[in-house]
Amino acid sequence: FVLGDDDAILAPEGSSPQPWERDENATATINYTSGTTARPKGVQITHRNIWTNALTFALHAGLTDRDVYLHTLPMFHCNGWGMPFALAGLGVPQVVLRKVDGAEILRRVETHGVTFMCAAPAVVNAVLEAAQSWEGEIPGRDRVRIIVAGAPPPTKTVARVEAELGWE
């Protein structure tokens, strides 16, 4: 649905917004875990959880409205739960991948002017591998910042990202 284009579907004529009481502790979403550390479960996320998480992400990552974000993590990952809210709150454009592919990530960085992403170590390795056969200058040099999540990246990988990609 697109606001402005699909208003008749979203709010039929004659309807009006229903009154509601604001409650920062009310459940906003239920996110389902994959069960990597325990049995899978639905986790209730409150409006306050979302706000606090978004604010923390934005401050920690140094995000501004001049950034362009590339999603490489699944939306069910903990960064996937919080980062879209931080980005939307700042007005940051968000670029989404259908599947993780190192060369496609480099293309999106080049095409969309990506400045920031979060990625698992395996994704970083895929980008490093794709960069070896990339023709021309690596896109995003001295512009892209990356937060690696899911597991600590090996020191050699960090050094390669800085040296070969020019990313921070």
Which residues does each PLM region occupy?
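Conserved coil-to-alpha-helix start sites within the AMP-binding
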Residues: 72-90
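Conserved S/T- and glycine-rich ATP-binding loop of Class I adenylate-forming
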Residues: 27, 33-36, 69, 75, ...
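Conserved pre-ATP/AMP-binding loop-to-beta segment of ANL
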Residues: 15-32, 39, 62-68
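ANL superfamily adenylate-forming
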Residues: 1-24, 131
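Conserved ATP-dependent adenylate/AMP-binding module captured primarily in the ANL superfamily
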Residues: 8-13, 53-70, 101-115
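Structural detector for helix-capping/boundary residues
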Residues: 25, 47-48, 73, 112, ...
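Conserved adenylate-forming
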Residues: 1-4, 89-93, 98-168
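Conserved AMP-binding A3 loop
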Residues: 28-52
